[in-house]
């Protein structure tokens, strides 16, 4: 994951100091891209320990179409707690948009089911897209989508995915986002009987929070270790039938965890 450290260094060296919604302050760059060949290992950051349980359960939660944190709590995941209301609701965030995008005529579109069928039927389509950025419902969401839009691409029997992330907390959020979408790409590839291509991450406002600078320097002082391997142990009938125990990570030998505050 040298690419990740290179991004951190680029922000420190070339970034602009900016104010932000949370009042914390950031150093930011605009427009950055990284590419990960999913055949060369699972792109999970090794220069600090990442909480894989949270990454997997959050993805399964998105795929369930759920927008209440109850499922996350049942599985000891608390990463959405700061934004939930007293009943655990978040409004129509990722899961709602992925699985039940409302249309003006009263229908609801399951974008995940739709894109998988499109990949199978028309793999060369340039419309293999899922969007969480529903302008008509942004004001109902506890947090506007940061990872807003992703597109699949099939070539030579391999599936690739590109994510556009309009806003990126590089220290805390980005390691989760990369691993989550890499895993989603693996799952969709399995469902469509395709090999693995690349995961391409594209960032808009790509930033380090001002209260993450010490942690960033510590992480930059560490040498990246070999990437782990992720295996999917079962082939469920549907993208919606995966369980936590279907995923096996091996060879993950990270440096120790680095704690940092979340900007809310």
UniProtKB/Swiss-Prot annotation:
BP GO annotations: dTMP biosynthetic process; dTTP biosynthetic process; methylation
Species this chain originates from: Shewanella amazonensis (strain ATCC BAA-1098 / SB2B)
Name of encoding gene: thyA
Subcellular location as annotated: Cytoplasm
Pathway noted in the entry: Pyrimidine metabolism; dTTP biosynthesis
GO MF terms held by the record: thymidylate synthase activity
Active site (record annotation): 146 (nucleophile)
Binding site for dUMP: 21, 126-127, 166-169, 177, 207-209
Top-level taxonomy: Bacteria, Pseudomonadati, Pseudomonadota, Gammaproteobacteria, Alteromonadales
Catalytic function, reaction form: dUMP + (6R)-5,10-methylene-5,6,7,8-tetrahydrofolate = 7,8-dihydrofolate + dTMP
InterPro entries: Thymidate_synth/dCMP_Mease (IPR045097), Thymidate_synth/dCMP_Mease_dom (IPR023451), Thymidate_synth/dCMP_Mease_sf (IPR036926), Thymidylate_synthase (IPR000398), Thymidylate_synthase_AS (IPR020940)
Top class in the EC scheme: transferase
Signal peptide interval: none
Self-association state and partner proteins as the record states: Homodimer.
EC number: 2.1.1.45
Sequence positions that bind (6R)-5,10-methylene-5,6,7,8-tetrahydrofolate: 51, 169, 263
Designated name of the protein: Thymidylate synthase
Principal location listed in the UniProt entry: cytoplasm
Similarity annotation: Belongs to the thymidylate synthase family. Bacterial-type ThyA subfamily.
Disulfide partners: none
């Amino acid at each position: 994951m040298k690419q990740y450290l290179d991004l951190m260094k680029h922000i420190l060296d070339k970034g602009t100091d900016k104010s932000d919604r949370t009042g914390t302050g950031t150093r930011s760059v605009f427009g950055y891209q990284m590419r990960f060949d999913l055949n060369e290992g699972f792109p999970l950051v090794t220069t600090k320990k990442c909480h894989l349980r949270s990454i997997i359960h959050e993805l399964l939660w998105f795929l369930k179409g759920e927008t209440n944190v109850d499922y996350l709590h049942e599985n000891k995941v608390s990463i959405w707690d700061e934004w939930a209301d007293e009943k655990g609701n978040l409004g129509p965030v990722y899961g709602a948009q992925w699985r039940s995008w409302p249309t003006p005529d009263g229908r609801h579109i399951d974008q995940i089911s739709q894109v998988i069928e499109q990949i199978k039927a028309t793999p060369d389509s340039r419309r293999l897209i899922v969007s969480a950025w529903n302008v008509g419902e942004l004001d109902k969401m506890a947090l506007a989508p940061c990872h807003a839009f992703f597109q699949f691409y099939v070539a030579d029997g391999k599936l690739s995915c590109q994510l556009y992330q309009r806003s990126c907390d590089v220290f805390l959020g980005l390691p989760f986002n990369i691993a989550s979408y890499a895993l989603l790409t693996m799952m969709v590839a399995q469902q469509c009987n395709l090999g693995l291509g690349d995961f391409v991450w594209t960032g808009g406002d790509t930033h380090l929070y001002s209260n993450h600078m010490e942690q960033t320097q510590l992480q930059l002082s560490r040498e990246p270790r070999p990437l782990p391997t992720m295996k999917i142990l079962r082939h469920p009938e549907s993208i919606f039938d995966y369980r936590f125990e279907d995923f096996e990570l091996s060879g993950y030998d990270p440096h120790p965890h680095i704690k940092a505050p979340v900007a809310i």
